[in-house]
Amino acid sequence: MREGSDWIEAGIALLQKVRDTQSGAIERASEICAEAIGAGGFVHLFGTGHSRIPVEEMFPRYGSYPGFHPIVELSMTFHTQVVGANGQRQAMFIERTPGLAEVILSNFQFQPKDAVMVFSASGLGAVVVEFARGARRRGLPVIAVTSIAQSRAGEMEGGARLMDEADVVIDLCTPAGDALCRLEGLPETPVGPGSTLAAVAVADAIKVRTAELLLATSKLPPVITSVAEVGRQRSDELFEAAYREHARRAARSLAT
């Protein structure tokens, strides 16, 4: 019994492909992020469905720092209920709704020094496509983290694909159906999606490289750090400093 080793091997191969083919795009994205954060701005992060996971991976958590601004709408990301109130059917319907992205964007006052990063494996839903389009219309550079194979295989709902509305495209390198493993006796339905693994890896790669670039210019904000690394007092100091810095930037970003 291989106990899931097939998926682990497929996941390793996927990460190697991302590393080997997307390093240039990751570097360009990191430069955009460093420029925005170093100037005192925000990199606004957006994703629907399971793409909220890489958004939350960026900030706030251990090893992260202010400058990344997560924007997550619970109506499109609350998946654990599955059926009934707040169920999956509603979430999938909402993320296809034209015009909603502009309503979300209207809550924020974007600065010229800001940037936007949108995560979506398919890159096809109306909300993510229109969110990226609206950000570009506001003059902001847009980074798309998406699967080119999935995007090309699917049906456009927002009049375009996310990758068509971005200045930098990072390919998750996942197959058209996302899942990585085909099991004997189950020819139609592959199992074990890979997009979350790849998206989180891309998120952390950008986070680390952006930190390096900011450190080189002495503009890296406080890094949230575990008690296990620096002790309780220092950990608390770093948490508070990071939250205060995030609050300072966020106060300028809310539309009034």
List where the protein language model places each region.
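Acidic, Ser/Thr-rich low-complexity intrinsically disordered segments
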Residues: V230-T256
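Internal, active-site/partner-interface "lid" segment
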Residues: D178-C181, P187, A201, E212-L238
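Flexible, glycine/charged-enriched surface loops at secondary-structure junctions
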Residues: T21-A29, V43, L215-I224
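Glycine-rich phosphate-binding loops that contact phosphosugars or nucleotide phosphates
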Residues: G38, L45-K207
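A short, well-structured juxtamembrane/interface segment
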Residues: T21-G38, I104
